[in-house]
């Protein structure tokens, strides 16, 4: 050997014991022989190989079952590994190998450990030279320990080591909790490197290293204040008791202290332990133990009397009571031992218990399945019995299970049909109701779905509800996810509506209040008297004064050349006026109600406009006058208050629309009606007798009057919201001469524009719309214009001037553009002949004949001669008669000379002339249309005055003789007789044959549906279309347009279906309000049921033109056709040809302003529609 020793190592047992069990300690001179036997002197391998370690293996063989149990470092006998002796050197670098995890946090922080309690796998070869495993080999201090001490430590029982070990928790050196248990050895000690069988317990920490759950010092720190108080309290006597009955038993024991010997337990007080409170019983000094001198216990002897107790105090110290009371009347809300919160600190937090507070409940009672399992038994403990669930039936007291759900997260465009199709897969549905915004009527993205309950089986419907809730995870509606929640009473839907309304109210802009005007000067106000209208107002102002509140502003304080109506509108723009009119004596400002009138008067009276002060007179609307027919026709629906920009834009658009309507009416529609009403096309109609010469105005005079007077486009009897009634004024021209000026000639545009009326599809025939180009095409217009023949001689009896005037005002609504043209487009044979004859004319002749006639006159030569004969009789007092006196420029010059000395008034001459001529226009039209009824002789009063005769009732039959609308009711309209009466009636069939044919047609369609697998558009054709009667719409004597029967209709026959756009009730209400604001006087809304309305205002058939009558000829019924509700008009009696169709609107009865006058004129007329 290296040290010169020839002794071989003695083999040892499996636990490190020697084979001979002699345990003879080695000679001191031989220490370290084992180390030098296998290592070189430089403490390294020295280039040795595995063969050099074979002697060591023979000296310390492993047990026989080494290979049987796996062997190696990770087997049963890992300590016998041949390289295990080298692993002992790095015990401080790797965690110890142990069976259980003693310190998990320590092992988790060790980055070198991959397996808790195990070393990572090593290479089978020795570690490299100079590795860290041998860094302690160079330290001589680890090899100076005696081998006997090593053997003793190795063979020592672990329990003895635990017994002799120091208490690390109590020792100051081991107070640190993060102390590594593997560093328990002194720094100078190192284990022997060649110890073949080191003790496994060497690397194990002692059991005292475990941290105690409850330590004495923790208890002391937590209850330090309590213990201090108790100790102080123990030194003082308790307070006196209230009575003797409630005396503590501990006091009785102290009173009988000399009856028997007290048991001494040292310093422990038995009374304190029994009672559990140191406050109730005072502590006494312990009795000393008597011990005999011989060391044996002696019999008990009498004890000397105890020293007297200190006198009792009447009251405790204040600080003691505060300390004890705070602890006894409080409860612990924060325990630092149970929850570690750095913000709350390490001390407990107490809360004072108030009187009358609710007792503390066991938190386990809130959890029905709370239980404590036993760690010793694997058997599942018995839980609480399940509560039985009973099925709902008629005898159940509890409410039924929920069957309604609310679907959220939907798109606002999602319809109820889509939701129905989706949730039908979960069960049969009873109702699907969309949650709608009450303000707009649109969906808010939610829907209520209720499952159907059949035969009181609520459980089945509830199961469908559960399926729908479970299906929301994967289901989608319109490619979007949705949420489903039970909502039996609809409370969640109401909450959604409230949130939507609150959001809309929040977004709404606050209404700006009108600026407060500065107070006017009272001195000036007192000086200005209340103005009074002096002149007679215009008809329009007079009519508005009857039905509206208004303010009159005197014109004598406001010069007309400096203040205009636009200035008044600008100053009063913040108030709710709807019209401002300028009259001769001042301005009239009209309001809808008295409140706006009072506000305007109080704020603006005395204010200055362009430097001039306003003097106002307020006239309130005290009583609403009963509406007459004329007032009903002139009443217009006023738009709501708008901002100034919106109002200006609306006014501009309205004026442009009125101008456009006027141009279309005068240039397009007039020409179309002229061509359509060509007398050549109505030769079979009876001609009216020619008017007398006294009633026929002079053609030249009328033309001259139109030169200085603007063309009237508005009538006082206008009915807003409907198409104008075009009338023909037949005016003869017996004094027409060739010397008439070319300047006064009226050109008539003759372009046919029948397609303008055809804005919507007719219900009788399918036709495509005809559009009017924006930029007119001259060539196309010229081609469409009918070219007239040149006439060599025109008889005076046939010469006429077609003057067209509209009975509508400038407030005509869109209804004018929505009238259907159900008239057939056919070409007149006469027009074709004229076109063929005109093809030979040159271009100049075509243009001349297209736009006007060539009058028979030539330029005059020489001195001027009178062109017309003077009209005999006195001078006329009307504007037209006065204009008739002026024939030419010479007459105008003479008139000017005659009026030189008269100072003209400062008025607008054109407006004044137009107003006065416009007053009698309606009467002139009636006289021109019915000249024989203009002055009926049947009711000429003998006295010459109607006032002198008094009031008398005129019979209904007599009214039909002279009233125009009554006469129209009795006499069929001639325009309905346009059809060729020469057509043979061989194809006519009675109503019974028609019904039979219709039934056969319907049966054939149903048979084809059954034969074909799929339905086509042809089979889905509306069946009612084939059953309708031939009807036409035309001007009605009752109101605007009406529907007329072309052929006789028998009673109880179906006439036509009321077709329109099907909308909900909420949408219908909004549309009705919009129609009224836009000026559409009539809205064609027909209610089908409580939630469905048919709107035929803009999309509908000609059935919407049926008027109301108190004695109707038709009735409306709602029938079902293939599951859909239809509105059908049936004949209630036999209807003759060309008779107007009417039915009762059946409006609800109302009173006051809401009543609508009835214009049917029937003998049984009620007077009002409602």
Curated annotation (Swiss-Prot):
Annotated segments matching region Disordered: 1-382, 625-646, 687-843
> Where is it mostly found?
nucleus
User: PANTHER family attached here?
Assistant: HISTONE-LYSINE N-METHYLTRANSFERASE SETD1
Could you tell me which species this protein originates from?
Answer: Yarrowia lipolytica (strain CLIB 122 / E 150)
* Functional description taken from the UniProt entry: Catalytic component of the COMPASS (Set1C) complex that specifically mono-, di- and trimethylates histone H3 to form H3K4me1/2/3. Binds RNAs which might negatively affect its histone methyltransferase activity. COMPASS recognizes ubiquitinated H2B on one face of the nucleosome which stimulates the methylation of H3 on the opposing face.
User: CDD domains annotated for this entry?
Assistant: RRM_SF (cd00590), RRM_spSet1p_like (cd12303)
Does the keyword Iron belong to this entry? no
Q: Where is each SET domain found?
A: 1029-1146
Where the record annotates domain RRM, the positions are 403-489
What assembly does the database describe for this protein?
Component of the Set1C/COMPASS complex.
Residues in domain Post-SET? 1154-1170
List compositional bias (Polar residues) regions by residue number. 278-294
Q: Where does S-adenosyl-L-methionine bind?
A: 1145
- Biased amino acid composition, Acidic residues: 811-836
Q: What class of enzyme is it?
A: transferase
InterPro entries (UniProt xref)? COMPASS_Set1_N-SET (IPR024657), Nucleotide-bd_a/b_plait_sf (IPR012677), Post-SET_dom (IPR003616), RBD_domain_sf (IPR035979), RRM_dom (IPR000504), Set1-like (IPR044570), Set1_fungi (IPR017111), SET_assoc (IPR024636)
Stretches of Pro residues bias are at 302-311
List GO molecular-function terms, semicolon-separated. Answer: histone H3K4 methyltransferase activity; histone H3K4 trimethyltransferase activity; RNA binding
What is the name listed in the Swiss-Prot or TrEMBL entry for this protein?
Histone-lysine N-methyltransferase, H3 lysine-4 specific
Enzyme Commission number(s) of this protein: 2.1.1.354
Q: Which cysteines are joined by disulfide bonds?
A: none
Tell me a GO cellular component: chromosome
Entry domain remark: The RxxxRR motif forms an adapter helix that bridges the nucleosome and ubiquitin.
